[in-house]
């Protein structure tokens, strides 16, 4: 008798679990549908907002960044295609793709001098000169947005964060590991240069580890050698502030 009660209890428990699972699946489906409806409404409102504030989005970099952030919230990419609503209303696709071409042009022009590394602010300055005074104003956010689209071309373009909130634009198809970026950050804090003794003192690295990084950076033409002092100095021209290679 007890065994029968046990079987009935187990069956009832299984049935209850199935009912709870069905209710859970139903709730999940309803929640997903509600979220989809909300996103659709948000997208429609975003299109109305874009139409209403078209001039501000096109002319004001900060407003354009705000608009881009709103798009990212709902997974809308106004730069994904040169066709469709966003490009027709705002022309943002053409704007960022044109900016991307100009970024490539400048990075290629100075690659032999800086080894494919350039400070973001320096790149922005070159872009403003190239575009002219009467062109649409750009910001570093615009540059980052364009570079994110250039990644479809491969690993040639990347953004490296260094100390002091500064950023470097990498335009060479090589992968920089943590050792490479640690050296760059150290150089950025030391007037754009490093020495072997400085690296040993600050990073506690072995000579072999230092030489491996230096040889790689030399091979990629990212650093220059200065042997005029008692100890060899390695300079990063990409970190020289307000330096022009023209």
From Swiss-Prot:
Cellular localization per UniProt: Cytoplasm; Endosome membrane
Name of protein: Vacuolar-sorting protein SNF8
Pfam families, sorted: EAP30 (PF04157)
Gene3D superfamilies for the chain: 6.10.140.180, Winged helix-like DNA-binding domain superfamily/Winged helix DNA-binding domain (1.10.10.10)
Positions in coiled-coil regions: 8-34
Species of origin: Dictyostelium discoideum
GO CC annotations, alphabetized: ESCRT II complex
Assembly with partners or alone: Component of the endosomal sorting complex required for transport II (ESCRT-II).
Mode of membrane association: Peripheral membrane protein
GO terms (BP aspect): protein targeting; protein transport to vacuole involved in ubiquitin-dependent protein catabolic process via the multivesicular body sorting pathway
Family: Belongs to the SNF8 family.
Keyword match NAD: no
Main function: Component of the endosomal sorting complex required for transport II (ESCRT-II), which is required for multivesicular body (MVB) formation and sorting of endosomal cargo proteins into MVBs. The MVB pathway mediates delivery of transmembrane proteins into the lumen of the lysosome for degradation.
Record key words, sorted: Coiled coil, Cytoplasm, Endosome, Membrane, Protein transport, Transport
Origin: domain of life: Eukaryota
